[in-house]
From Swiss-Prot:
It comes from Pseudomonas fluorescens (strain ATCC BAA-477 / NRRL B-23932 / Pf-5). It comes from the Bacteria. Binds 1 zinc ion per subunit. This is Acetyl-coenzyme A carboxylase carboxyl transferase subunit beta. Zn(2+) binds at residues 31, 34, 50, 53. Its main location: cytoplasm. Pathway: Lipid metabolism; malonyl-CoA biosynthesis; malonyl-CoA from acetyl-CoA: step 1/1. One of its GO terms (cellular component) is acetate CoA-transferase complex. NCBIfam families: accD. Its cofactor is Zn(2+).
Length: 306
């Protein structure tokens, strides 16, 4: 073996490997909006909101519930329910195989998690969509878990909050999935009759059968900044009407301007503002919100090759 190979090339390769392995995977994240390279521990402190441009990144259902509810006294509702391939549906892949893959990827049985707990000491029930599970699509189990959460709210006479993030009805369940639109709408009508508040929080994105049912039936409809909300996607609409859509069409700011939603609240403010709003709706004293102390984080230099 030549001296050049031993003295120059091999040490160079070894240094390169050491350099690569010295940066743990997942420690850095690039903002999809401004492309700033963000330190993961720092990003967690801001609840996955970019500190540079305020872009609200998508987060999972459990993470969303964790940052919203009080830490103590939580209980999951309908956790035992699992989807069934009743129609033996197959497109390019068997539905049961898609379910298995989604369950393995997310660790969840289906695309909605419902949980009872407290918000600033006030009893509430929360549902949150897991968009990573087949695009947060609504099938029989999603509908049933939502209904169980609403029935819990009826039984305990406590407010209900739902965080929507969905592509719509689950096509693999055909009419069974479409039936969930009526099923969830019916139970929300019961909440309204009983005077129990339901707050719908729209997160990026909300489309199809979910936007055409439960997501737009809140007594108060809230959205995160720049969330995409609609029935069909902008591209489909442009191809149908053969016109260029306005800038920002289907963004939450556009919907607020045109009266389709009530307010836009940033993720960091959801707990105190919704807690205050629900207390007013329930005739309760304004809850005290104490922000958790933020410890300073030493941010190391970002890798150049991210």
């Amino acid at each position: 073996m030549s001296n050049w190979l031993v003295d120059k090339l091999i040490p160079s390769i070894m240094r390169s490997e050491v350099k690569k392995s010295s940066v743990p995977e997942g420690l850095w994240h690039k903002c999809p909006s401004c492309e700033a390279v963000l330190y993961r521990p720092e990003l967690e402190k801001t609840l996955d909101v970019c500190p540079k441009c305020n872009h609200h990144m998508r987060i999972g259902a459990r993470a969303r519930i964790d940052i919203f509810l009080d830490a103590e006294g939580r209980a999951e509702l309908g956790a035992d329910l699992e989807p069934v391939d009743r129609l033996k549906f197959r497109d390019g892949k068997k539905y049961k195989d898609r379910l298995t893959a989604a369950q393995k990827q997310t660790g969840e049985k289906d695309a909605l998690i419902s949980m009872s707990g407290t918000l600033l000491g006030m009893p509430v029930v929360v549902s949150a969509f897991e968009f990573s599970f087949m695009g947060g699509s609504m099938g029989a189990i999603v509908g049933e878990r939502f209904v169980r959460a609403a029935n819990y709210a009826l039984e305990k006479r406590c407010p209900m909050i739902c965080f929507s993030a969905s592509g719509g009805a689950r096509m693999q369940e055909a009419l069974i999935s479409l039936m969930q639109m009526a099923k969830t709408s019916a139970v929300l009508a019961r909440l309204r009759e009983e005077g129990i508040p339901f707050i719908s929080v729209l997160t990026d994105p909300v489309y199809g059968g979910v936007s055409a049912s439960l997501a737009m039936l809140g007594d108060v409809i809230v959205a995160e900044p720049k969330a995409l909300v609609g029935f069909a996607g902008p591209r489909v609409i442009e191809q149908t009407v053969r016109e260029k859509l306005p800038e920002g069409f289907q963004r939450s700011e556009f919907l607020l301007e045109h009266g389709a939603i009530d307010m836009i609240i940033s993720r960091q403010e959801l707990r105190p503002r919704l807690g205050n709003l629900l207390a007013q709706l329930m005739g309760l004293p304004t809850p005290e919100f104490v922000a958790a102390p933020v410890e300073p984080i030493v941010v190391p230099p970002a890798p150049a090759n991210l």
